[in-house]
Regions:
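Short, charged, intrinsically disordered terminal tails
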Residues: 110-118
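Arginine/glycine-rich "motif VI" loop of SF2 helicases in the C-terminal RecA-like domain
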Residues: 54-57, 117
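Surface-exposed, interaction-prone regions with an acidic/low-complexity signature
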Residues: 26-28, 35, 39, 85, ...
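Short, small-residue-biased leader/transition segments that mark boundaries at the very start
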Residues: 2-3
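Short, solvent-exposed amphipathic alpha-helical segments in soluble enzyme
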Residues: 53-55, 109-111
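ATP-dependent NMP and nucleoside kinases share a basic, alpha-helical "lid"
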Residues: 10-54
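Small-molecule kinase domains that catalyze NTP-dependent phosphoryl transfer to phosphate-bearing small molecules
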Residues: 57-102
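Short, amphipathic alpha-helical "lid/cap" segments that border enzyme active or binding sites
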Residues: 6, 101-109
């Protein structure tokens, strides 16, 4: 990981922001004002969602998800030495299969309002 990436993430985190991926949960692990959230779903739900969004066959969608998951896990491990998706690295996990994709933004907004972040 380049030092410019680390610096960019740390600079962004000086103000309220949302950072997707890039090992930000590990880069910012020592900060008190950070909330690390992992969004996940059952594999079958993910396959169906990708099939619909990208007009793919079941096998092509499954292959795409498998490849993407492998790349994410590899990238995360390479840069942190940790397992991608390990529940111990996150403050909150949102399972869109259980909660519904459409409900997750509302859940987060309610949580942030409760903590008076917004």
């Amino acid at each position: 990981r380049r030092s410019s990436d680390l610096e960019a993430i740390r600079n962004l985190a000086e103000k309220p922001c949302i950072i997707l991926g890039r090992c930000a949960s590990d880069i910012l692990k020592d900060r008190m004002n950070v909330l690390n959230i992992f969004v996940c779903a059952d594999k079958e739900d993910r396959i169906k969602r990708i099939m619909k969004l990208e007009d793919l066959s079941y096998e092509d969608a499954k292959e795409k998800i498998d490849k993407t998951d492998e790349q994410r896990a590899s990238y995360y491990y390479e840069h942190t030495g940790k397992t991608w998706g390990d529940v111990n690295d996150y403050h909150m996990i949102l399972d869109t299969s259980a909660l519904g994709v459409e409900n997750c933004p509302d859940i987060l907004m309610h949580y942030f309002e409760k903590l008076e972040y917004i």
